[in-house]
Amino acid sequence: MDYDLVMEDEFDALCLDVRRDHDSASKTKYPAKLHARKVVKELGVDDGLIYLPGQPDISLENSDQPRLFRQRRYFFYITGADFEDCAATYEVKHDKLTLWVPYVEPRQVLWFGSKPSAAECKRRYDVDEVRYTTQLSSFLRRFAAQPEPPVVYILHPDQAPDLGHGSQSQLRLDSSLLLPAMDRARVVKSDYEVAMVRRANDISSAAHRRVAERILRLTNEREIEAIIQAVCIANGSRSQAYPIIAGSGANGATLHYGANNAPLGGKQCVVIDAGCEWNCYASDITRTLPLSGSWTPKAAAIHAIVQRMQQECIAKVGPGTAWRDIHLHAASLGMEGLLGLGILKGRREDVARAGTVAAFFPHGLGHHVGLEVHDVSGTLALSAAEGHGTQLDFGKRAMVTPSMLADMTRSASSPDAAGVQERKTQLLLPNMIVTVEPGIYFCREYLEGYFRSDPAHADFIDWDLLEEYYDVGGVRIEDCILVTEDGYENLTVAPKGDELLDVINKGEK
């Protein structure tokens, strides 16, 4: 991979030109038709109409200022169109995908600029036809007027199409099948989508590198956030996939910390979780940096445990692997590490049976990445905690309680239970993109609020020794991993390990 590094004096940000062979994908048409056909395959029908409205232009409440636009991801998936007030229809029987775009009056151009024309949309997106939304109602009325109109598939009842002219809808609507079908289609990425996530990771990795180069000169968490945004914007990405997390000291123990306004002085570490979007596709990267340029003994010990957790878990990624098993391996390594430090104590078997390590590693190992940073998981969850009615869903960050972890461990070791769980648990497939993000956290409120008074766990924790680790805060390391035919590829190129320490201490070139 080659980089061209350019200083942009206007905002003192690193401009990154990443040259890869796969970047040509971003210059081709968005594969809308491919994605629509994937959806129909999962839908399992040979006739009908898929109707998806895009995000309308909406003003802030009691204001004439617009809300920050974010395209509806299901609509985007089968069109690639990233502007307001559009819609999409796909006629299943005729394999015809139509993008409906708004007509922009000249006076609107004066105030707000133009939007892509119908001809431009045809060049950008692999759709069969581009028409104006002013014609959509008449199209739908003709569809409804058929002697036996096919079913119209919509995501939600409140997205039923408007036939206009006060007509009562004669459409046969189904809002139960499309969403799960689209989730199953989205969970395995097309090559185009992989290229988009790769590009987002390249830019975000450059942002993390730039923070590492400057970290010894920074004084406040907000400076970290500013650098990340500047680097991403300078490289063409104006949108972060999620709010930037820059938690120093005890703030690093808050999983979704967002204030980003605390001074860095006197802290051991800072957890930086940040990833931008490229063409609506997300990245998700976390690095933990020593603020002095070297690890304190306590932070070094925790970082070593988390680093091993991530390295070994990434090595286990491959087609046919159950995510539950990788998560359990991470939890086992975390438990062994904390037992070695004396933070956890007691017989290994007893600690494992209780699941007490979840007090320190309280979230799932990872999630899908795509059009959402916590992307859809299809129909099956990554892991299922039997008896809890709660799933460790790839698409949403979920709390992993000790009892859930204990149930997962028991099901994995019991042949009968494992068979049931295997049918409930998602196996990794080629072209899935997942994060591997183990972490160990010392959140005083969480630990003392739930575990100190719980006899099932209190005796397995050395509370006096734990006091010496609260100032570490937390350590998390996260990369985006592409599942390949024969294993995996790490899409994240942000420095970590010894390379990260070298970057920190060498500073800016």
From Swiss-Prot:
Pfam families in UniProt: AMP_N, Peptidase_M24
Any one of the GO BP annotations: proteolysis
Binding-site positions, Mn(2+) 1: D284, E437, E478
Enzyme class: hydrolase
Cofactor dependency: Mn(2+)
Co-factor binding comment: Binds 2 manganese ions per subunit.
Xref: InterPro entries: Aminopep_P_N, Creatin/AminoP/Spt16_N, Creatinase/aminopeptidase-like, Pept_M24, Peptidase_M24B_aminopep-P_CS, X-Pro_dipept-like
Protein name (Swiss-Prot/TrEMBL): Probable Xaa-Pro aminopeptidase MAC_04092
Source organism per UniProt: Metarhizium acridum (strain CQMa 102)
